[in-house]
UniProtKB/Swiss-Prot annotation:
Membrane-spanning ranges: 20-40, 77-97, 129-149, 174-194
Annotated family: Belongs to the connexin family. Delta-type subfamily.
Alphabetical keyword list: Cell junction, Cell membrane, Gap junction, Membrane, Transmembrane, Transmembrane helix
Name under which the protein is recorded: Gap junction delta-4 protein
Function: One gap junction consists of a cluster of closely packed pairs of transmembrane channels, the connexons, through which materials of low MW diffuse from one cell to a neighboring cell.
InterPro entries: Connexin, Connexin_CCC, Connexin_CS, Connexin_N, Connexin_N_sf
Membrane topology, as annotated: Multi-pass membrane protein
Complex formation: A connexon is composed of a hexamer of connexins.
Pfam families: Connexin
Region: Disordered, residue numbers: 331-364
Gene name of the encoded protein: Gjd4
Amino acid sequence: MEKLNLLGFLIITLNCNVTIMGMIWLIVEVLLRMLVVVLAGSPIYEDEQERFICNTLQPGCANVCYDLFSPVSPLRFWLVQSLALLLPSVVFGTYTLHRGAKLAAVGGACRPQVPDLSTAYLVHLLLRMLLEAGLAFLHYFLFGFSVPARVSCSHVPCSGAVDCYVSRPTEKSLLILFFWAVSALSFLLSLADLLWILPRRKTLRTTQWVNGEARPVCEVPAPPPCLLQNPQGYLSQGQVDQEDRQEEQVVPEFPCMWTAGQSDNSNVGQACVSGLLEHSDQDASEATSSAGDRLTVAHTAHELRFHRETSLDLGGKNTQADELSLATQSHLARHSSASKPQAPCRLTTSGSAPHLRTKKSEWV
């Protein structure tokens, strides 16, 4: 990875600063409160005012009695209660993501440390518990614990005591009791979370004081900075240079020094084949030049023998002629070996050695 996975770091930051009790509370809040409000409360209270019937035909009396019975719709109150209790958690999550993103941006390629946000988590817990208690008190003041089947009303514009009847009172009472149970469970989970975080925060402070440095709760298992900066991975620069030198030493000076198994199916093998063809052409030219040299030597020897037979004495003439013949042959052999061009590369085949021995015997 060239860059740090920001999303993964933010998720780990939230995971390290939120306890298991906080996660359970969030599940209870979403599943047992908000979904029940939407799926169960909405069908029950959708015709609440229409089914609220009073035993009078006085205009406006039914509306006044219903307003006294239910100043606030329970469905709307429960929805507002759920959103209000989620507000501290949303604020804490936003603050955690902001701190995590800031640390990740400043850290760069170095390993970022998860910030310790136990103080902010404690403040958010206290605020959530206060909201839970306040909304529970308001819920009791508005709705109580049950829904009556009949309501008496004597306010203006009613002409006297008027009885009004509520639709589905038992079902509404059960739903109210369910939300009371959810509120109690939510408060207990918040209290357990508070008791969970206090010893943990005290232990963290003791650890920081003993070590003399601020330690995070947990760390992200990120790769070391050298891996992010060095494209060769965990190898150091010296190891990389050593490997490069070894690779340069392995490559031979001439492509033809490679064996046949290494040069097959490669461009280098084709280069070696072309080098071998050029070397065979050079061998043919060398053979032609050596044949010409042998003809010259033979012609010179024939002249020497003719001169020896016609001019000087047989004993002294033969000795001088042999010495002159040997000197001439050695001079021509040195001249032919000096004029021979070197092969561009050494052959590794087994057939080259006998060929060279044959040429050497021919020169001698």
